[in-house]
């Protein structure tokens, strides 16, 4: 039996995780960090850092899906990963992972000049704008455009009702429009990813992991 503590259980993602875990016989959501095997965190940066300290005290692996960290907070997380297995990801869906791989493949073969727009849409309650995933996509493009064929990258953010998450990356010039898009039709895709990672991270050594370490 895998015992999971969820930080942010009363939120949208916490409720989704609770719902998905209820369908799995060998996983239990518990209320005590001291007695859990792994922690999943979907909360706010300040709450994440508090739970991080408790994980450090108890040597418990931590899966963080919270967004909106500043650079100082990210440095604290990085330092903590020297002592416990830790994953920080702004999007744990396998679909977004596939989207990122497709963009990397496109950039590795591209020989044309393009401009780029990243358009992201989320629900109105989402605090950070642009989304962490949109920022990650921008960084992926910057890091994989080895020959500087992408002249500009702009992020457009939109907040509307009843949207789980849409990310669209458009490369365009006066001849072509190349579009990569992922839309989350259910919040459960993020929950399933977080649960799968939680099951695996308990076997890992202390380090700062990414989704790539689990979905390859």
Where are the language model's segments positioned?
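C-terminal substrate-binding/catalytic lobe of Rossmann-fold NAD(P)-dependent oxidoreductases
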Residues: 3-7, 12-36, 112-216
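Hydrophobic beta-strand scaffold residues
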Residues: 29, 62-63, 86-88
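N-terminal Rossmann-like NAD(P) cofactor-binding module of classical short-chain dehydrogenase/reductase
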Residues: 39-40
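Rossmann-fold NAD(P)-binding glycine/threonine-rich loop
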Residues: 46, 53, 66-87, 94-99, ...
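Conserved strand-to-helix beginnings and helix N-cap segments that scaffold or border functional pockets
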Residues: 52, 74, 99-100, 130-134, ...
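Rossmann-fold dinucleotide-binding core
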Residues: 84-131
């Amino acid at each position: 039996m895998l015992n999971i503590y969820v930080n942010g259980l009363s939120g949208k993602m916490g409720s989704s995780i609770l719902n998905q875990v209820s369908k799995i016989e060998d996983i239990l959501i518990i209320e005590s960090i001291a007695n859990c095997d792994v922690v999943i965190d979907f909360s706010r940066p300040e709450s994440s850092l508090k739970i991080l300290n408790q994980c450090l005290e108890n040597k418990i692996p931590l899966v963080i899906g919270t967004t909106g960290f500043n650079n100082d907070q990210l440095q604290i997380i990085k330092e903590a990963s020297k002592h416990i297995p830790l994953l920080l990801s702004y999007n744990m869906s396998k679909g977004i992972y596939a989207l990122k791989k497709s963009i990397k493949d496109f950039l590795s073969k591209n020989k044309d000049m393009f401009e780029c727009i990243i358009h992201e849409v989320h629900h109105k309650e989402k605090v950070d704008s642009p989304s962490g995933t949109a920022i990650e996509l921008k960084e992926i493009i910057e890091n994989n455009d080895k020959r500087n064929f992408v002249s500009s990258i702009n992020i457009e953010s939109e907040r509307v009702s009843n949207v789980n998450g849409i990310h669209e990356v458009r490369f365009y010039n006066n001849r072509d429009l190349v579009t990569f898009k992922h839309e989350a039709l259910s919040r459960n895709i993020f929950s399933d990813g977080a649960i799968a990672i939680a099951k695996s991270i308990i076997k890992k050594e202390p380090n700062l992991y990414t989704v790539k370490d689990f979905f390859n």
